């Protein structure tokens, strides 16, 4: 009986929630060096745990070498120069069509292993136009999280009146 109870308690404490949902409205913009998006997870040490999505131009086409301002936060932490083509191919995709975008983080790292309990930062970066970037970030403690919304903070490289400022809007993150 004790073994069953211990196993049950272990299951309940490790399965507090299944994933984190990340939803946002994306509007395709015109202009030089725009429409670049990256979504990734960092641990409490500021190390990348997993890239969930990054646009092809920046990743697969190594666009960050042509335009240093393209997703410079993601490039700085993900270090795509050290990634193989197959690693980049696994996380990159075409720039999405305008509309609401839905992504999930399944609490795994880039190798598909469940992450240990702890604090993680989910970050969504958008290159709006040339050197103008935004980063939306939410924090989740996988060892102490309850289902519901995650507060999202926005960091801008320029004022809100910058060109293409409406590219990423209504960013929502939640524990499911």
Which residues are covered by each model-predicted region?
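Primarily secretory-pathway and cell-envelope proteins
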Residues: 18-61, 132-176
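Residue-level preference for beta-strand/loop junctions
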Residues: 33, 97-99, 118, 167
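Short, cysteine-centered beta-strand-loop-beta hairpins and adjacent loop/turn segments enriched
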Residues: 112, 131-132
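Bacterial N-terminal signal peptides that target proteins for export
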Residues: 1-5, 39
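Sec-dependent N-terminal signal peptides
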Residues: 4-14
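Structured domain cores in non-transmembrane regions
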Residues: 44-116
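Beta-strand-rich extracellular modules
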Residues: 125-129
């Amino acid at each position: 009986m004790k073994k069953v109870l211990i196993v049950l308690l272990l299951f309940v404490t490790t399965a507090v929630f299944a994933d984190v949902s990340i939803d946002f409205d994306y509007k395709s913009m015109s202009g030089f060096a725009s429409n670049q998006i990256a979504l990734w997870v960092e641990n409490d040490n500021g190390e990348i745990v997993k890239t969930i999505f990054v646009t092809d131009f920046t990743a697969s086409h190594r666009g960050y070498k042509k335009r240093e301002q393209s997703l410079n936060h993601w490039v700085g932490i993900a270090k795509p120069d050290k990634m193989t083509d197959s690693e980049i191919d696994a996380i990159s995709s075409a720039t999405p069509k305008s509309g609401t975008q839905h992504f999930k983080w399944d609490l795994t790292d880039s190798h598909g292993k469940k992450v240990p309990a702890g604090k993680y930062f989910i970050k969504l970066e958008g290159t709006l136009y040339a050197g103008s970037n935004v980063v939306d970030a939410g924090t989740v403690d996988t060892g102490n999280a309850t289902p519901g919304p995650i507060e999202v903070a926005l960091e801008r490289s320029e004022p809100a009146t910058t060109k293409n400022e409406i590219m990423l809007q209504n960013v929502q993150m939640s524990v499911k």
